[in-house]
From Swiss-Prot:
The lineage of its organism: Eukaryota, Fungi, Dikarya, Ascomycota, Pezizomycotina. GO terms for cellular component: cytosol; nascent polypeptide-associated complex; nucleus. Disulfide bonds: none annotated. One of its GO terms (biological process) is protein transport. It holds the Pfam family NAC. Component of the nascent polypeptide-associated complex (NAC), a dynamic component of the ribosomal exit tunnel, protecting the emerging polypeptides from interaction with other cytoplasmic proteins to ensure appropriate nascent protein targeting. The NAC complex also promotes mitochondrial protein import by enhancing productive ribosome interactions with the outer mitochondrial membrane and blocks the inappropriate interaction of ribosomes translating non-secretory nascent polypeptides with translocation sites in the membrane of the endoplasmic reticulum. InterPro entries: BTF3, NAC_A/B_dom_sf, Nas_poly-pep-assoc_cplx_dom. The keyword Cell membrane does not apply. This is Nascent polypeptide-associated complex subunit beta. One of its GO terms (molecular function) is unfolded protein binding. Its main location: cytoplasm.
C-alpha cells in the first residue's frame, strides 16, 4: 500500500513539473495565438428529404416475386367499390396477377370518387351490391328533387313585399 502511495506522489509531482515546463516554454502571447478558438464559419444545416418507404416497396416486390406474378396488359381502369358508396378509381394502372395465389397487385394513383361521377361508364361493371347502392343513391336523389319542388310550391303562398307596403295589409 505504501508503494502505491509513493507512486501517486511521483506522478503528481511530475505532472506539476510538466505544467510548469509548459508555461516556461510558451509565453502567454504565443499560447493565445496558437490555440485561439472561435466560432469560425457555422455548420451548414442539412435539409433532409422526407423518409421514403423504399424498404416496404422492396419487401413487397420480393414477396410478389416469390408468388410469381405476371403483368396483365391492356387494362384501362380499375374501380374498387367501398361500403360507403364511394369508389377508388385508378386510371391506366399497372396490374400484376398471381392467379394460383388469388393475388392481384395494382400500381397507380388512386382517387376517391363518388359513384355519381362514374355512373355512365361503369354500369356494366356494377355487381349486385353496387347496383343496390346505386338504387339507394337514385332514390335519395329523387327525394332531394321532391323536397326542392315542395319548397318552391310553398313559396307561392307567401306574398311578395313591396317597399312602402305593410305585410299585414297584404294578408287582409
Amino acid at each position: 500500500m505504501a508503494d502505491v502511495q509513493e507512486r501517486l506522489k511521483k506522478l503528481g509531482a511530475s505532472a506539476r513539473i510538466g505544467y510548469v515546463l509548459v508555461n516556461f516554454f510558451f509565453s502567454q502571447a504565443s499560447i493565445g495565438s496558437r490555440w485561439k478558438t472561435g466560432k469560425g464559419t457555422p455548420r451548414r444545416k442539412m435539409k433532409r428529404a422526407p423518409a421514403r418507404s423504399g424498404g416496404d416497396d422492396k419487401k413487397l416486390q420480393q414477396t410478389l416475386k416469390k408468388l410469381n406474378v405476371q403483368p396483365i396488359q391492356a387494362i384501362e381502369e380499375v374501380n374498387m367499390f367501398k361500403s360507403d358508396g364511394n369508389v377508388i378509381h385508378f386510371a391506366a394502372p399497372k396490374v400484376h396477377a398471381a392467379v394460383p395465389a388469388n393475388t392481384f397487385a395494382i400500381y397507380g394513383n388512386g382517387e376517391d370518387k363518388e359513384l355519381t361521377e362514374l355512373v355512365p361508364g361503369i354500369l356494366n361493371q356494377l355487381g349486385p351490391d353496387s347496383l343496390a347502392s346505386l338504387r339507394k343513391l337514385a332514390e335519395s336523389y329523387q327525394n332531394m328533387q321532391k323536397a326542392d319542388g315542395d319548397k318552391e310550391a310553398d313559396d307561392d303562398d307567401i306574398p311578395d313585399l313591396v317597399a312602402g307596403e305593410n305585410f299585414e295589409d297584404k294578408v287582409e
